């Protein structure tokens, strides 16, 4: 018997909200947008899209979502952060704005805008065996993206860059039910990263 579709929210303050919603629905979830505390309380998991991490941090406070979201993460809410979402989930940030705060939860140190300006963005196919399960690699599109400088012992490294000046840098991690990627899978039409996250949420809901 197939388990019911989990309800996964997409934080709708900035970023590729529609693309994330479409990828989640293709992956078998019921996707909803989240802008208010009441909407956040009704989800089984959450996606933090890309955008500008300092702006999202400020908007989380404006919409009074920040503390509630920190509490839900501490309680075990599955969360997937892409690009700026990775920064928001990180416990430590290098090259952040002076007053920038994160939600935390991932025992990683990330470097903000590690790939440089938007014109210095990077593309690379990533094997991601835990997600692709023997299939073709995932297209990684990095736009002013962070990378992980250091990862704690409980953090699973899912992908590193294999070429270019940043070869060896960590660009996808998982710790418990928290998932983060430096790249933007939502804009490639490949829903496998989102499908993987939907499975994470489904397993959490099933207990």
From Swiss-Prot:
Keywords (A to Z) from UniProt: Glutamine amidotransferase, Hydrolase, Lyase, Pyridoxal phosphate
One of the Pfam families matching this protein, by short name: SNO
InterPro entries attached to this UniProt entry: Class_I_gatase-like (IPR029062), PdxT/SNO (IPR002161), PdxT/SNO_CS (IPR021196)
Reaction equation(s) it catalyzes: aldehydo-D-ribose 5-phosphate + D-glyceraldehyde 3-phosphate + L-glutamine = pyridoxal 5'-phosphate + L-glutamate + phosphate + 3 H2O + H(+); L-glutamine + H2O = L-glutamate + NH4(+)
Pathway annotation: Cofactor biosynthesis; pyridoxal 5'-phosphate biosynthesis
Catalytic activity, EC: 4.3.3.6, 3.5.1.2
Domain of life: Bacteria
GO BP terms, alphabetized: glutamine catabolic process; pyridoxal phosphate biosynthetic process; pyridoxine metabolic process
Cellular component terms per the entry's GO annotation: cytosol; glutaminase complex
Residues that, per the record, bind L-glutamine: 51-53, 112, 143-144
A GO MF label: pyridoxal 5'-phosphate synthase (glutamine hydrolysing) activity
Active-site residues (renumbered): 83 (nucleophile), 184 (charge relay system), 186 (charge relay system)
Family statement: Belongs to the glutaminase PdxT/SNO family.
Role description: Catalyzes the hydrolysis of glutamine to glutamate and ammonia as part of the biosynthesis of pyridoxal 5'-phosphate. The resulting ammonia molecule is channeled to the active site of PdxS.
Protein name from the UniProt record: Pyridoxal 5'-phosphate synthase subunit PdxT
Organism, scientific name: Kineococcus radiotolerans (strain ATCC BAA-149 / DSM 14245 / SRS30216)
């Amino acid at each position: 018997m197939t388990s019911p579709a989990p309800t996964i929210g997409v934080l709708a303050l900035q970023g590729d909200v529609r693309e994330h919603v479409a990828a989640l629905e293709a992956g078998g979830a019921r996707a909803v947008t989240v802008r208010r505390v009441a909407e956040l309380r009704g989800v089984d998991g959450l996606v933090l899209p890309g955008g500008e991490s300092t702006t999202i941090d400020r908007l989380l406070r404006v919409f009074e979502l920040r503390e509630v979201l920190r509490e839900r993460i501490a309680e075990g809410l599955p969360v997937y952060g892409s690009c700026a979402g990775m920064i928001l989930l990180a416990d430590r940030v290098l090259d952040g704005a002076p007053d920038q705060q994160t939600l935390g939860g991932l025992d990683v140190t990330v470097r903000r805008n590690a790939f440089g300006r938007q014109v210095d963005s990077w593309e690379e196919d990533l094997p991601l065996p835990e997600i692709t399960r023997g299939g073709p690699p995932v297209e990684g599109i990095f736009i002013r993206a962070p990378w992980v400088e250091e990862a704690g012992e409980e953090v699973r490294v899912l992908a590193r860059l294999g070429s270019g000046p940043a070869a060896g840098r960590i660009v996808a991690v998982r710790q418990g039910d928290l998932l983060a990627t430096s790249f933007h899978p939502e804009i490639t039409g490949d829903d496998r990263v989102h499908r993987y996250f939907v499975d994470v949420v489904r397993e959490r809901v099933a207990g």
